[in-house]
Amino acid sequence: MGETLGDALIDPESEPFAVTVSARTSQEITMVDTEMPFWPTNFGISSVDLSMMDDHSHAFDIKPFTTVDFSSISTPHYEDIPFPRADPMVADYKYDLKLQEYQSAIKVEPVSPPYYSEKTQLYSKPHEEPSNSLMAIECRVCGDKASGFHYGVHACEGCKGFFRRTIRLKLIYDRCDLNCRIHKKSRNKCQYCRFQKCLAVGMSHNAIRFGRMPQAEKEKLLAEISSDIDQLNPESADLRALAKHLYDSYIKSFPLTKAKARAILTGKTTDKSPFVIYDMNSLMMGEDKIKFKHISPLQEPSKEVAIRIFQGCQFRSVEAVQEITEYAKNIPGFVNLDLNDQVTLLKYGVHEIIYTMLASLMNKDGVLISEGQGFMTREFLKSLRKPFGDFMEPKFEFAVKFNALELDDSDLAIFIAVIILSGDRPGLLNVKPIEDIQDNLLQALELQLKLNHPESSQLFAKLLQKMTDLRQIVTEHVQLLQVIKKTETDMSLHPLLQEIYKDLY
């Protein structure tokens, strides 16, 4: 008997090993004993040729879980076995006309919010100016969000305008001795006390500096905010250091981050726009435009396009599992867990993470494929024959809602770590250390969201609810896979995905 997934974690320096897939009982799908190297001991994954997937020794053998469709998403149909090549000039002309209808879909999403200054969160997007709007700087007069450095202090637009009008028009307000409290909702009730508050906090007509906060002033204020937080809770410095570590690991593990994907979708990148696939003709043209890393949808003309693309998605899924496992190894405490528990956490967590990160590649109109080289429209995916046309719609519905939370990569880095360290997975041997790690991650996530999204007080609770939503998406995906298992006799599942599905639930 060959080694198991657990053996893969024992010696990270050893060579990739072979896993023996034994014949199953008569109640299950019969499988020929096949040795297939697919999960190296460094917790990565070596590639498997597509030809191996055609071997029916790897036919569907799944428990209730899900295959994955990461960034090379697609499952087209149209009963198409080989396609004749269209005339390139005619095809290009038709594509350009049709593209005008779809090009706007790539630029409708707002850019993902920028990261915090390194002074505050210990990490930031390289060479990118952090936005004042995300710094949680309050107006010194009323406590509303400051829009900048106005008349010598950080002030909101309302108080800036009020002070300017008072000074320019030389307004004199009726005296009030009540020392009224000035805050966002009451600032217009007593103009005298509001003006006195402006003067008290240091607003002056001699300091007529408008607009953005000077960099030195900004860094000073951010350092003060960070220091205040650390004094209130000494553990927060450790939590922010953990957030920085996870973010750094995330950037190293996942080549196509949300920031990069959003730049492509919003047209903010200097690279050429992705090739839009909206029908079968444009899919054929994509053969020449897109550099497919593993498999082109048209490389095997003897198979239906839907099946060929589905197999390509499986290759991307294997890559995604490799990226996630490498990231998991960098979560503090993960590699010290029981070896079997490490495997269990990954088996159950990878798909939920894949769908989380898939949302970064989506907008309401389509999804980026092939590392951002292509953009496949939602309508095209929905038009595919059943059951393939049903696969992606739940993911789009989730993505639209999830993207509305406006998380950035620094938020996602902690969130996916929380998903991995879920102590309620079936079959765990030692739950306590897993829950201890997750508790620490949850504290880091809560602090991160307070710093990065000060205006969204319920964001932490909303994000935890998404973990439940992800499990439901996985369940629905499995139900579709069970349909394919029965109806698509030519379909096969990648051996690594078989190993992940085996003995789940």
Swiss-Prot record:
Keywords attached to this entry: Activator, Biological rhythms, Cytoplasm, DNA-binding, Isopeptide bond, Metal-binding, Nucleus, Phosphoprotein, Receptor, Transcription, Transcription regulation, Ubl conjugation, Zinc, Zinc-finger
DNA-binding annotation, residue ranges on this chain: 136-210
Tissue specificity field: Highest expression in adipose tissue. Lower in spleen and lung. Also detected in ovary, mammary gland and small intestine.
InterPro entries: 1Cnucl_rcpt, NHR-like_dom_sf, Nucl_hrmn_rcpt_lig-bd, Nuclear_hormone_rcpt_NR1, Nuclear_hrmn_rcpt, PPAR-gamma, PPARgamma_N, Znf_hrmn_rcpt
Subcellular location: Nucleus; Cytoplasm
One Gene Ontology molecular-function label: chromatin binding
Cross-link Glycyl lysine isopeptide (Lys-Gly) (interchain with G-Cter in ubiquitin) residue location(s): 252
Domain NR LBD: 238-503
Coiled coil: none
Stored SUPFAM superfamilies: Glucocorticoid receptor-like (DNA-binding domain), Nuclear receptor ligand-binding domain
Motif (9aaTAD): 495-503
A biological process from GO: negative regulation of inflammatory response
Residues spanning the signal sequence: none
Zinc finger (NR C4-type): 139-159, 176-198
Domain of life, source organism: Eukaryota
Post-translational modification: Phosphorylated at basal conditions and dephosphorylated when treated with the ligand. May be dephosphorylated by PPP5C. The phosphorylated form may be inactive and dephosphorylation induces adipogenic activity. Ubiquitinated by E3 ubiquitin-protein ligase complex containing FBXO9; leading to proteasomal degradation. Ubiquitinated at Lys-252 by TRIM55 leading to proteasomal degradation. Ubiquitinated by E3 ubiquitin-protein ligase STUB1/CHIP; leading to proteasomal degradation.
Region called Interaction with FAM120B, residue ranges: 205-280
Matching Gene3D superfamilies: Erythroid Transcription Factor GATA-1, subunit A, Retinoid X Receptor
Regulation: PDPK1 activates its transcriptional activity independently of its kinase activity.
A GO cellular component entry from the record: nucleus
Domain notes for this protein: The 9aaTAD motif is a transactivation domain present in a large number of yeast and animal transcription factors.
Subunit structure: Interacts with FOXO1 (acetylated form). Heterodimer with other nuclear receptors, such as RXRA. The heterodimer with the retinoic acid receptor RXRA is called adipocyte-specific transcription factor ARF6. Interacts with NCOA6 coactivator, leading to a strong increase in transcription of target genes. Interacts with coactivator PPARBP, leading to a mild increase in transcription of target genes. Interacts with NOCA7 in a ligand-inducible manner. Interacts with NCOA1 and NCOA2 LXXLL motifs. Interacts with ASXL1, ASXL2, DNTTIP2, FAM120B, MAP2K1/MEK1, NR0B2, PDPK1, PRDM16, PRMT2 and TGFB1I1.
Family from the record: Belongs to the nuclear hormone receptor family. NR1 subfamily.
Function: Nuclear receptor that binds peroxisome proliferators such as hypolipidemic drugs and fatty acids. Once activated by a ligand, the nuclear receptor binds to DNA specific PPAR response elements (PPRE) and modulates the transcription of its target genes, such as acyl-CoA oxidase. It therefore controls the peroxisomal beta-oxidation pathway of fatty acids. Key regulator of adipocyte differentiation and glucose homeostasis. ARF6 acts as a key regulator of the tissue-specific adipocyte P2 (aP2) enhancer.
Designated name of the protein: Peroxisome proliferator-activated receptor gamma
Gene responsible for this protein: PPARG
